From Swiss-Prot:
A single GO BP: killing of cells of another organism
Role of this protein: Antimicrobial venom serine protease inhibitor. Exhibits inhibitory activity against chymotrypsin (IC(50)=19.56 nM, Ki=15.24 nM) and microbial serine proteases, such as subtilisin A (IC(50)=6.57 nM, Ki=6.83 nM) and proteinase K (IC(50)=7.11 nM, Ki=7.02 nM). Has not activity against trypsin, plasmin, tPA, thrombin, factor Xa or elastase. Binds and inhibits Gram-positive bacteria (B.subtilis (MIC=29.45 uM), B.thuringiensis (MIC=91.03 uM)) and the entomopathogenic fungus B.bassiana (MIC=30.09 uM) but not to E.coli.
InterPro entries: Ser_inhib-like_sf (IPR036084), SerProtInhib-TIL_Domain (IPR051368), TIL_dom (IPR002919)
Keyword field contains Secreted: yes
An MF annotation (GO) of this entry: serine-type endopeptidase inhibitor activity
Protein name per the record: Venom serine protease inhibitor BiVSPI
PTM section of the record: May be O-glycosylated.
Amino acid sequence: MSRILFVFLAVMAIFSTSFGQQCGLNEEFKSCGSCEPTCAKPRVTICTMECKIGCQCKSGYLRNGEGTCVLPEKC
């Protein structure tokens, strides 16, 4: 019985993190993202490789000071 409960809770946790996440314009959900480039620091030189679950800018976009993902020329 406890094994079934564990499997059920594990499946629910996976579904709630991957399907319940809504990202903004030019963003995508990453289950293990890190070191997101920004307008202030477009090139990340040092990265800790720490997994951060959540929305990050799509490839080719940078996060501006307002928290929006924009093309580099819009910074």
